[in-house]
Amino acid sequence: MFTGIVQGIGQIISLSEVNTVTTVEIKLPNVANLAIGASVSINGVCLTVVRIDSDIVQFDIINETMERTNLGDLTIGDSVNIERSLKFGDEVGGHILSGHIFGTGIISAKTRSGDQMSLSIIAPPSIRKYLTEKGYIAIDGISPTVGQVDNGVFDLHIIPETMRLTTLDAKDIGDVVNIEVDSNTQLIVETIERLLKERGVE
């Protein structure tokens, strides 16, 4: 599990594909006590450590993950958001995340007002029913609060500290971002849908 509080930015060192599995090497900002088999969130995607060489950590990614997330768009030199898995007793500063991506969105607008940045993101149809103003969402592993929601487009208002610690400040219009829906929101929406269907209400 993760919390959506990014702990640093990693850099893609190498990418190679063999037999439908892509191996990626990432330079991590902190590898203290990191072990093979550990889970790490890379742009919100839960990946398993398969090799550690100093601060260069290797992960294997299957084709489905590459196709369903923005990891398939990565090239050498790109930056990614990093979060180590949650441990018992750790503070949950954002909200609980699984690292399982529901879909990808596209940035449709980016504006600045003083030190604050705002993004508008077009959500895929499959997750639009889970979007609520002031609700939880994860974008590339980051846990911001949803702003206004209008016809499948939702706004995020990003504080300076988040801009400094994550890759969001470097994002531009047209960029693809990974989206994970809050599990509690998903459960509530799908339970209500099921109950209404059982009662014959569409």
Tell me what each language-model feature is.
Residues M1-E202:
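Conserved loop->alpha-helix
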